[in-house]
C-alpha cells in the first residue's frame, strides 16, 4: 500500500495461505466495512485482461467452492502499520464479479465477501433441541461447531437470565445457526458479531451487550491546526429519539397485566454525555404480556438500548496522519468540536479503503448525550 503500511492477503479453504505475487501486483483497491450491527464485509478489486493468468486462478478457486462438501473460500487481510501486524478482516468469499475491458483498457475482477458469520448461515438446523440450557450455553455450543475456522466463542449471560425447565419447555432451534443466534440476541437485547482476534487466523464470536466501556482509542482532533488528524467530522443531535419502553407482566392469579417502565439498565453502556437525551415518548409493548417476567424484561431492555444514542457523528481520516487503524465497536475521544460535542464516543462503523499510496477510513460515531463526562480524553 505504501512504504509505511504493508498489506498481506491470504486465501484458501479453512486455513488460508499467502497468495502469489501475481495477485498482489494486480490488486487495485481493498474496501473493508466493520459495523456494530449486521455482518461486516470486504471487497477486493483486481486489474486483469483477457489473457491474464488471474482468470484461471479464480476459476480454480471458485470451482472448489461449489457444493456443501467443500468449505467456503476464506479470505484474510492483515495490515502491518508501524511494524505491528494486525488482522483487518477474516471472512469468506460470497461473490465474484467480472468487468470486461474496453477500448484497450484492462478489465477488473471484484471479489466480495462477508465475515465468518456467513459460514453459520449455510445449513438449516431447525428442530435441534437445547434442554435445560440458558441462552449463553446454547450460543457457546453452536459456535463450537466452527472451531476449525479459528472462531472462539465469547457469550455473556443475559442481565435477567431465563433457564428453561425441561418438564415445562425445551427450546428448539429455528433456522440456521446464524439466524437462531441473532434471534436469541434480539430477545435479550444483546448483539452478535464475529471480528478478527489479536492473532491472525483467529476470530472472536461475541454474544452480549454492546460494550461502551474500556480504554478509548487516541482522540480524533478537529480544527486544531497542526494537531488536526481527521479530514472531516460532522455532528447531529436528534432530541426526539429518546423512548421509554413499557412492558406488561401478567399476574398469574388475576391474569391482569401490570405495566412496568424499563430504562436502559446495561452496566456496560454507561452515559457518555452529561446531558442525556430527553424521553420523547413511551412505547407500550403489549405483546410482552404473554412472556414470563424474565423474557418480558429482556425484551424491554432490548428496546431501550435502541433509543439512547441521540448524538451521532460521521467523518473520515487518513490512517498515516492518525497514526493507527481506527477500530469499530470501541470508544474514541473527540477534541476541538466544542463543549457540546467533545468527549468520548462509541465507534459504530468503520469503512477502510486501501490502495497504493493511501489508506483512508470513513466512520460513524454515536453517543447517548451532550457535553463530555470527562475533562480530558487520551491524545
Regions found by a protein language model. Give the residues of each.
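Residues forming anionic-ligand binding surfaces in small-molecule and nucleic-acid pockets
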Residues: 111-126, 146-155
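Assembly/oligomerization scaffold segments
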Residues: 1-120
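Well-ordered beta-strand positions in beta-sheet-rich domains
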Residues: 29, 87-92, 110, 127, ...
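Short acidic/polar beta-strand-loop edge motifs in secreted extracellular
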Residues: 120-141, 156-183, 317, 377
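Short beta-strand-centered interaction patches in the first periplasmic/extracellular domains
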Residues: 106-111, 115, 154-229
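Short, solvent-exposed secondary-structure boundary/capping segments
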Residues: 97-113, 201, 353-366
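An acidic/polar, Gly/Ser/Thr-rich interaction patch typically located in mid-to-C-terminal regions
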Residues: 37-66, 225-379
